[in-house]
Every structure is written in C-alpha cells, then in structure tokens.
Amino acid sequence: MSKTRSFVLGLTGLLLLTAACSGDPATTGAPAGRGGGLSKVVLLGDSVAVGEALPMAAAFEASGVEFQSLAADGGGNVVGPFSDEHWEELPEQLAAAEPTVVVYQLTSYDWGSQQEQQAAYDKLLTTVTGVGAQLLFVTTPPIEPDDFYAPHMADLERAPEVARAVAAGSSGRAEVLDAGEVWGSTYQQVRDGVADRSADGIHTCPQGAARFTNWLLARLADRFPGFTPAEARTWANTGWAADDHFKGC
C-alpha cells in the first residue's frame, strides 16, 4: 500500500469520526444524489479555494449536485490586485454556469479600503443575483502572514465585516458563513497529529480541505432542506488528496 493511499484511508476515518461526534448531516445515512433545490454550486476564490475545490468536487458529485470551481491561483478576488482582469470574465462565466449558489471564499488578495471592498462585494452580489443564484460569502482560513501579506492584514481582517454589511442589506439574497467553526481564530498547522494547513501559513492540506468540505455541505443542507450530503466515506477516499496542489503538505 502506497504512502498516499494510507494517508487517504486515515483521512476517511477521521472525517467519519468527526462528523459522527458532531451530528453532521453528512453521516445521516440518507442516500446520496438528492440535491433538492440545490442543483449547482460554483466556487470562487484564490489558491486556497483551488485546493478546497478538490474534495468539494468529489463530495458534490457523490451528493448528486453539479459543481464548478472558478477559483484561481494567484487571483480569483473581486477587489484588490488582479480583480479588474477577473471582472472582465466573471459575469460571463457565471451566466454560463447557471448556478443555484455561488460561494465566494474571501481571498488573501481582498485588499482595499472599506469603500472599495463594499463596492466590489455589492457588485458581486448584483452579478450573482442577476444570474438567479444566491451568494454565500465564506470567511477565509486565518493565515500566518509573511512580509508580502503583513501590510494588508488590516484589509483582510476588515473584509468579513464588510461582507456582512453587504449581506445584511441584500434582502436575503446573500449570507456570510463563518468558517472559524472549521479553522479556529488563528492559524494552526497540525490538528489531531496530522497536517491540516500548509507550512506556508496560507494554504490547506488534504485533511483541512476535507474538513472544510464536510462543514460546507452541512451548512448547505441547513439552507436547502431537500439536499442530503453524501457520507464522507463516499468521497474522502477517491484520490484527490494525491493532487500536486498539496505537495507542500
């Protein structure tokens, strides 16, 4: 048995144990493939979301829901550097995707003033609702900033509150999910003896990406009563953890 294979099997056991202890809907035993009113989920974000998209793709497929990642390495943000280039393509991409829900995980590039952040998040809300979808902002995992990120930490720390203000004025078209339930309030590289976050202080490792996926599917089940997430054992051991994106873990 290969080292990678052994790791993924261990991850599966961990997920099942965690979900069973929490009463997570992912372990209800209900059959997969019941999307209810949730037909397609689109993920937006930066390279952190790129890694999380790997188990998400497997989990949504097992749950009978279409999934598409528009997350991007070195970008994917709607405010701050590179965002102008992203906006040139994003409206057409979302229109073509025809999602039910768009998940925007706040990125490590969401730099800008409060006014700039609010304008961008308002624009995202208008764009998402314009294609008939609901917008879910998700807070980013806490990072351990290096010299590149340190000057922008005030912007990143403000971003969730700006997103909440936009959601509060959206008449129910947007919501903010606090992923601190998954990550805690500070960067933690190792959890339960296994690498959960990358040593670079920014990205996730397979265990962390899988825990996030399990949590997100449960939150969607709360909001779409007809949606039954597949049990973790059906998607946590399907080979995605061997992707090169996790080579730093």
Tell where the protein language model's regions lie, with residue ranges:
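Active-site segments of SGNH/GDSL-like serine hydrolases
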Residues: 109, 127-157
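Bacterial N-terminal signal peptides that target proteins for export
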Residues: 1-11
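Catalytic His-Asp segment of secreted/periplasmic serine-dependent ester chemistry enzymes
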Residues: 143-249
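Conserved SGNH/GDSL esterase-like catalytic core that processes O-acyl groups on lipids
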Residues: 37-120, 239, 243
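Bacterial lipoprotein signal-peptidase II cleavage site
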Residues: 22-30
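C-terminal motif of bacterial Sec signal peptides marking the signal peptidase cleavage site
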Residues: 17-20
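Stable alpha-helical elements in mature extracytoplasmic
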Residues: 52, 56, 86, 90, ...
